[in-house]
């Protein structure tokens, strides 16, 4: 009877050890899977950050200003290139953008406010057509009220006919 008890005790101990090892190996697999998922998430976050940095670099190169011809709200090829850089960044995050329309000093105050608004709206419409939600875009017109270049020459006026992207 004592021998049988020792044998069943040993059997129980072996069964217990096998069960314990099996349980531990299951946790190891879960831990490995968890660590792998965390590693992938970190890699994805790092890649997203690198992509956003590349887009910000592209915006720095393209600029934040879209220029317009005299008495026009039609975007130029260069203006579309600037807007495209901002669109690419806006499509990677949930930030909003403010488009500030400006004019040169020629024309009445009322006319220039309306022209600045048409310019800001032209850029907004281009962004919306290219995938940016209109709810993320604010437009405002300053008309001739906030010039970047003082003077009454074509060189000054051309710098003031713009939409600033904020």
Describe each PLM feature range.
Residues 102-166:
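Periplasmic OmpA-like peptidoglycan-binding domain that tethers envelope proteins to the cell wall
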Residues 2-3, 83-85, 150-151:
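A generic local structural motif
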Residues 19-23:
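C-terminal motif of bacterial Sec signal peptides marking the signal peptidase cleavage site
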Residues 5-6, 72, 107-110:
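A short, structure-level motif marking secondary-structure boundaries and short turns
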């Amino acid at each position: 009877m004592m021998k049988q008890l020792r044998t069943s005790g040993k059997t129980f101990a072996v069964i217990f050890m096998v069960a314990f090892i099996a349980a531990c190996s299951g946790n190891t697999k879960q831990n490995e899977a968890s660590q792998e998922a965390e590693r992938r998430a970190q890699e994805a976050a790092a890649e997203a950050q690198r992509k956003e940095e590349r887009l910000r670099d592209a915006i720095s190169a393209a600029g934040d200003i879209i220029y317009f011809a005299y008495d026009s709200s039609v975007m130029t090829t260069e203006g579309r290139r600037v807007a495209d850089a901002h669109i690419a960044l806006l499509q990677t995050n949930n930030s909003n953008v403010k488009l500030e329309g400006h004019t040169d000093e020629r024309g009445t105050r009322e006319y220039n406010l309306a022209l600045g608004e048409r310019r800001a709206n032209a850029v907004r419409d281009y962004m919306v057509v290219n995938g940016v939600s209109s709810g993320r875009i604010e437009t405002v017109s300053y008309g001739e009220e906030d010039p970047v270049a003082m003077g009454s020459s074509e060189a000054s006026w051309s710098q003031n006919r713009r939409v600033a992207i904020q």
